[in-house]
Amino acid sequence: SIETDETEWLKHLQTPLFAWAAVGEIPPNISLDPSLKINLKDVPLIKCPPWLGIDRALAAWGAFQKSIQSCTMNPNGLLIADAGTVLSLTRIKANGEFLGGQLVPGLGLQLQSMTKGTKNLQYPSNQNYPSESFPISTEAAMLKGSIQSLLGTIIEAKQISQVPVWLCGGDSPIILKNLQNRNIE
């Protein structure tokens, strides 16, 4: 079963945590051993700026390590697209050097922004991606436009960087499906 309460989810872990990282506040009802916390200094990205989020650093380092281990590292590096609350694009060289990135509101933030920033738009109750190019319903149009903006950001960054894209994050399944529908790998 899928747990939405982090406390309940943590109770079901079969093995103890050997390390953890977090962006933002830890809920007060979750108890984590501070000695197991991964900090930015623990992630060996070259030229990693001190302000980089631990989520971006770990995603970049994970993609870098997987590329090295699988012998699929592109000579020009990688582009990591972490499609979560924020779509973060992180570019790294083939030697693991941080090259920068881009940040765009994720799907949920885009939909929330339209809902909160306008008088008559409601947060879509149906999260199914519309198949039509220009949907009639407002909810479908909001979803289509938001997802298209994420796809466009990723596609353009891939074209500019000319490197493989590693996709992760909560919105990655819908983004992957739409990239595959366009024959983009």
List where the protein language model places each region.
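Short beta-strand scaffold segments in enzyme catalytic cores
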Residues: 1, 78-81, 87-92
